[in-house]
A protein has these predicted regions:
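Short coil-to-beta microelement around the adenine-binding A-loop and adjacent beta1/P-loop entry
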Residues: 16-18
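The feature captures the beta-strand-to-loop junction immediately N-terminal to the Walker
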Residues: 36-38
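Helix-to-loop junction immediately C-terminal to a conserved catalytic motif
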Residues: 51
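Conserved ABC transporter NBD signature motif
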Residues: 59-67
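ABC ATPase nucleotide-binding domains
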Residues: 73-234
């Protein structure tokens, strides 16, 4: 078993900047958890705290039910793969993979067995005698993975391991890592800023922003049921179209009442009854001045006549500004304010992206009809940016996400208040931070010195053993 529990984890740097706020997550054994978000959101810091490379300012970290806040990295039984591979250039692939085991004084026969087994899994058996400089980026990354596999750790930590690879190799390595996870049946925690990597690899995904957790869920749930505007915009390529300052309006009364979303000029679309039934506290929004944001994914906007004929109440007119032919599909960038002569580069509130058939016959500046799939639209509160739609029977329920599915992230206003509050630092705090920083430098220097001495000692012992073996052979 190799589960992890993070309870109220916070990270505050000596400067007073808080990088992670109240991070809580229960990671089950054998899960593939992906931490995803834009640069600076705290995902790598969280991973480094799990590894023990960053001190936890407050909160508790448990591995297999054991509190490990004060346990040094080498005793946590975890292995980490870095973005830059971190291979020793003067050592062969074999020696790079075996180095950690040699430091632990594992017998030679077992080292040889584990290195060759890992090399077989990763398909690098033919490269064991080569130096890192003779390998491609993908091969180096496999060696870095192999070095962690031979240790047989409880948990694998991967910090943006594919970011240095080209697009084709990234796609290939995504598959390799997913296969490796299935084969090893071990807990993986993976950090990336690439939502495609997150969606294709993770059993659950943690979306982060500005140090705060936003949503913890399965890839499909994140796509279909984003909890707020940020998650909706971050997950999906191209990103979701947003129409702000929209309102819910009704026409008719009683059973004949129809509910529409009114947005941008005179555009409005009819909401199906199933969507209306999901709106939380609908009386707060319907026929009031309270604004909402309408979200529509590009793939839920249709240009084919058959769909338009069946959904006449969701049709809008738009002018085509850019056409991107991608072979299997075509992406069009449209201007909803089609009567204006030119679209604004600065103000994109009237612009949207649609995915249509690659067979569609269209031209630049054409004014065309587009129909929204109203069954798959998203509605968000105009102020808090939280979704105002309840989940329906399509929501994927899994036992691992019992707590995560109930998590409610802070609003942008609450996040800003906490960030500003964390930046208030007194003179006494600054003095203590400087003292802690000096102590941390001394500790790090001592650790580096000890590691270097251990490496030299291991190398010396290995040479001594080799000399003894040669002397025995000579005798």
């Amino acid at each position: 078993m190799s589960g992890l529990l993070l309870k109220g984890i916070n990270k505050v740097y000596p400067s007073g900047v808080q990088a992670v706020f109240n991070f809580c997550l229960d990671i089950r054994d054998k899960e593939f958890i992906v931490l995803v978000g834009p640069s600076g959101c705290g995902k790598s810091t969280t991973l480094r705290m799990i590894a023990g490379l960053e001190e936890i300012s407050s909160g508790e970290l448990y591995i297999d039910g054991k509190l490990v806040n004060d346990v040094v990295p080498k005793d946590r039984d975890i292995a980490m793969v870095f973005q830059n591979y971190a291979l020793y250039p003067h050592m062969s692939v074999y020696d790079n993979m075996a180095f950690g085991l040699k430091l632990r004084k594992v017998p030679k026969e077992i080292i040889d067995q584990k290195v060759k087994a890992a090399a077989e899994i990763l398909g690098i058996t033919d490269y064991l005698s080569r130096k890192p400089k003779a390998l491609s980026g993908g091969q180096r990354q496999r060696v870095a993975l192999g070095r962690t596999i031979v240790r047989e750790p409880k948990v694998f930590l991967l910090d943006e391991p594919l970011s240095n690879l080209d697009a084709k190799l990234r796609a290939s390595m995504r598959t390799e890592i997913s296969k490796l996870h299935a084969r090893l049946a071990t807990t993986f925690i993976y950090v990336t800023h690439d939502q495609i990597e997150a969606m294709t690899m993770g059993t659950r995904i943690v979306v982060m922003k500005d140090g705060f957790m936003q949503q913890v869920d399965t890839p499909q749930n994140l796509y279909d049921y984003p909890i707020n505007l940020f998650v909706a915009g971050f997950i999906g390529t191209p990103q979701m179209n947003f129409f702000k300052c929209a309102k819910l309006v009704s026409e008719g009364k009683g059973k004949a009442r129809k509910v529409y979303v009114s947005f941008i000029g005179n555009n409005k679309i009819l909401l199906p009854g199933s969507v209306v039934a999901r709106v939380k506290n609908i009386d707060e929004y319907l026929d009031t001045d309270k604004e909402i944001t309408l979200g529509v994914r590009p793939e839920d906007i249709h240009q084919d006549q058959a769909f338009i004929n069946t959904s006449p109440d969701t049709v809008v007119k738009a002018r085509i500004e850019v056409i991107e032919k991608l072979g299997a599909e075509t992406q069009i960038y449209c201007e909803l304010d089609h009567e204006s002569k030119e679209s604004s580069v600065i103000d994109n509130s009237t612009q949207m992206i649609a995915k249509i058939s690659s067979r569609a016959v269209i031209n630049l500046k054409d004014i065309i009809d587009l129909a929204f799939d109203a069954h798959h639209i998203h509605l968000f509160d105009g102020y808090t940016e939280a979704t105002i739609l309840e989940r329906d029977e399509g929501y994927e329920v899994i036992s691992e996400n019992a707590e995560g599915s109930a998590f409610v992230p802070p609003t942008p206003q609450e996040m800003r208040a906490q960030i500003d509050s964390a930046r208030i630092v007194t003179k006494e705090m600054k003095a203590q931070m400087k003292k802690d920083k000096r102590m941390a430098k001394r500790t790090e220097a001592a650790a580096q010195k000890q590691a270097a001495e251990e490496a030299m000692k291991a190398e010396s012992e290995e040479k001594t053993e080799e000399n003894n073996d040669e002397n025995k052979d000579a005798e």
